[in-house]
Amino acid sequence: MTSVDFSKGLVPTIILDDQNGDVLMLAYMNEESYQKTLETGYTWFFSRSRNELWNKGATSGHTQKVKQIWTDCDNDTLLIRVTQIGPACHTGKKSCFFNLIKEDF
């Protein structure tokens, strides 16, 4: 199994909908949240603002069941495909990426 490079403390973690490949959110994992994700099969992240671990959906019920975990070529960024239950964004939107800045370049 490929190891993840946590030498900088946190790794950006991109969450994709396993059904359609849509980007749902970006969060950060530290080594402990990564291990909890591997152990439970559900996403755990590290909150930079609260300085603590959080289990996605533990309060809202909008959980993310892990289907696949990928790493980039440097092993310092993760991409996780999930089965999303309910919206991924705390605003109630399906994805955290709903603010279009510009298109038609």
UniProtKB/Swiss-Prot annotation:
Its cofactor is Mg(2+); Zn(2+). Mg(2+) binds at residues 72, 74, 76. Binds 1 Mg(2+) ion per subunit. Zn(2+) binds at residues 73, 89, 96. The keyword Coiled coil does not apply. Pathway: Amino-acid biosynthesis; L-histidine biosynthesis; L-histidine from 5-phospho-alpha-D-ribose 1-diphosphate: step 3/9. The keyword Zinc applies. One of its GO terms (cellular component) is cytoplasm. It is found in: Cytoplasm. Catalyzes the hydrolysis of the adenine ring of phosphoribosyl-AMP. Belongs to the PRA-CH family. This is Phosphoribosyl-AMP cyclohydrolase. It comes from Listeria monocytogenes serotype 4b (strain CLIP80459). The gene is hisI.
